[in-house]
């Protein structure tokens, strides 16, 4: 009995060569629309699906393969009962289904209007794929050109057939998830209300050597059609990115961009293990980098750096004496790239990608599920800061408090930041008590704490932090407020002659 293959693909990579090989092996080929035109144009004998169904394509191609002559041939078990039913209807079996789907994701990604996006929701393709995958014992299902060579073997094992079926269902599942995400994104309920059902449409974009540690496999995935500054960054110099490099670069860039939106000048953020360790703003990138580096030279070693303005040759040279893992910037001049490649060949130098379609959701894995929330993207201008002490902050202290607030918001809780003149002088992050975070920040600052301001991402349960800060020379404090002992903390500030500002906005980060 002659074997039959149905080929209908949007991605035509390798399809002519594959079809030619099948035809040479005696297969009868069926096809539709553009694929039929491609194959027949290449001189390959092929029948139109409409010749098999006896029914023309209709509704501008929306209905082509949704017919018993097609799905009966795919779904029939190769046993007497099913084959007899096919014979009674003069339907032949279909032994191979090679289908990939309308380019829905790509259509969304290029910003096509809604009617065009909707028209690129494939109906017949997923139906054929799912039918073939269900009957994979008898039907080979191919959704990836990488599997064409396998299908040309004399025998395909049951295990390989099952693998191809699983791959096919994954293909349609991801496709449906992309459609769901698109349609849900148009809902008036988002982003102010989390949906009852949330699909994570993830596509692997990079394979890394391992995850956080060598014994953990790891990879980088794209969520839907989103584009990000780090996952879509251009690596212009240095080694391939690691799992930890991606995580730290994303944290550094996020904080850098938040500060750049509220500060005048160039911003530099140095990060270690997703926590800021040196942050500064200055007139140019070179100066901002030098100030951020000098804020904590010990912790910056082996860190990841993000800057808000292009890196030129002079800025590149100023990084010569410090070992860094990653530098990410909006641009890097060609002479700076050449210098990095020659003088710091291990440094990964990234030109940030342009964010597009980024979800407002922050998704954290739990055992058996996910914790989902809206991202903490509240800007300073949304706050209503209130001075709650007798002493008012000076103009410079206000500027430093605003700067410190953004920095501490980007650190892991419990977190305290000391800042002065647009640079961090002491940081304490990831502490299990607030006083320990303050002690670490103040110890890190040393004499630079004199005249600095202090910001905390959450309230003070006691007056111990403000007393410690005042003893180190801190002159102004910022915190959300809202603790039971707020009156005691305010009284301590008045007693010590320092200012305190309540923001009314907590910023835990776990």
Swiss-Prot record:
Disulfide linkage: none
Q: Give one GO term, molecular function aspect.
A: phosphoribosylaminoimidazolecarboxamide formyltransferase activity
- Identify the Gene3D superfamilies for this entry: 3.40.140.20, Methylglyoxal synthase-like domain (3.40.50.1380)
Endpoints of the signal sequence: none
Task: State the InterPro entries in the record.
Answer: AICAR_Tfase_dup_dom_sf, Cytidine_deaminase-like, MGS-like_dom, MGS-like_dom_sf, PurH-like
GO BP term, pick one = 'de novo' IMP biosynthetic process
Task: Name a single GO cellular component.
Answer: cytosol
Which ranges carry the MGS-like domain? 1-143
**Statement: the UniProt record of this protein carries the keyword Transferase:** yes
Task: Answer yes or no on keyword Hydrolase.
Answer: yes
Which SMART domains does UniProt cross-reference here? AICARFT_IMPCHas, MGS
Q: Which reaction does it catalyse?
A: (6R)-10-formyltetrahydrofolate + 5-amino-1-(5-phospho-beta-D-ribosyl)imidazole-4-carboxamide = 5-formamido-1-(5-phospho-D-ribosyl)imidazole-4-carboxamide + (6S)-5,6,7,8-tetrahydrofolate; IMP + H2O = 5-formamido-1-(5-phospho-D-ribosyl)imidazole-4-carboxamide
> What's the entry's take on its domains?
The IMP cyclohydrolase activity resides in the N-terminal region.
Task: Supply the PANTHER family for this chain.
Answer: BIFUNCTIONAL PURINE BIOSYNTHESIS PROTEIN ATIC (PTHR11692:SF0), BIFUNCTIONAL PURINE BIOSYNTHESIS PROTEIN PURH (PTHR11692)
Q: Which family does it belong to?
A: Belongs to the PurH family.
Q: What is this protein called?
A: Bifunctional purine biosynthesis protein PurH
């Amino acid at each position: 009995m002659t074997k039959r293959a149905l080929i209908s693909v949007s991605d035509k990579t390798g399809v002519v060569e594959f079809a030619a090989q099948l035809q040479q092996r005696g297969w009868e080929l069926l096809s539709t629309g553009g694929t039929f035109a491609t194959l027949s144009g290449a001189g390959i004998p092929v029948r139109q699906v409409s010749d098999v169904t006896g029914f023309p394509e209709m509704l501008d191609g929306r209905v082509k393969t949704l017919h018993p002559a097609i799905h009966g041939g795919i779904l029939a078990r190769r046993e007497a009962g099913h084959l007899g039913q096919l014979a009674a209807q003069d339907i032949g079996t279909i032994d191979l289904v090679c289908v990939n789907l309308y380019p829905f994701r790509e259509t969304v990604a290029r910003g096509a209007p809604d009617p065009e996006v909707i028209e690129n929701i494939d109906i017949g393709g997923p139906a054929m794929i799912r039918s073939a995958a269900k009957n994979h014992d008898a039907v080979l299902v191919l959704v990836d050109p990488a599997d064409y060579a396998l299908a040309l073997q004399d025998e395909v094992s049951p295990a390989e057939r099952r693998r191809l079926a699983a791959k096919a269902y994954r293909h349609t599942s991801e496709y449906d998830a992309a459609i769901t995400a698109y349609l849900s994104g148009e809902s008036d309920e988002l982003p102010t209300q989390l949906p009852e059902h949330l699909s994570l449409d993830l596509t692997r974009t990079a394979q890394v050597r391992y995850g956080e540690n060598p014994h953990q496999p790891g990879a980088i995935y794209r969520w839907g059609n989103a584009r990000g500054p780090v996952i879509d960054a251009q690596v212009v110099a240095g080694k391939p990115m690691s799992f930890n490099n991606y995580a730290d670069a994303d944290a550094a860039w996020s904080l850098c961009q938040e500060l750049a939106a509220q500060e005048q000048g160039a911003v530099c953020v140095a990060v270690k293990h997703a926590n800021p360790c040196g942050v500064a703003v200055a007139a140019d990138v070179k100066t901002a980098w030098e100030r951020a580096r000098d804020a904590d030279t010990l912790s910056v070693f082996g860190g990841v750096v993000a800057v808000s303005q292009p890196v030129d040759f002079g800025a590149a040279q100023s990084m010569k004496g410090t070992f860094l893992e990653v530098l990410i910037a909006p641009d890097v001049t060609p002479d700076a790239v050449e210098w990095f490649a020659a003088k710091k060949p291990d440094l990964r130098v990234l030109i940030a990608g342009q964010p597009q379609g980024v979800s407002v959701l922050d998704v954290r894995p739990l055992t058996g599920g996910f914790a989902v929330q809206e991202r903490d993207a509240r800007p300073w201008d949304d706050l209503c800061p209130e001075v709650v002490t007798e002493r008012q902050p000076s103009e410079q202290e206000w500027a430093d408090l605003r700067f410190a607030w953004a920095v501490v918001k980007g650190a892991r809780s419990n977190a305290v930041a000391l800042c002065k003149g647009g640079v961090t002088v002491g940081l304490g992050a990831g502490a299990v008590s607030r006083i320990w975070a303050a002690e670490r920040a103040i110890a890190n600052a040393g004499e630079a704490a004199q005249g600095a301001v202090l910001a905390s991402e959450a309230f003070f349960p006691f007056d111990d932090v403000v007393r410690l800060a005042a003893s180190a020379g801190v002159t102004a404090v910022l915190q959300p407020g809202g603790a039971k002992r707020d009156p005691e903390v305010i009284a301590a500030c008045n007693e010590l002659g320092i200012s305190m500002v309540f923001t009314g906005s907590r910023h835990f980060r776990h």
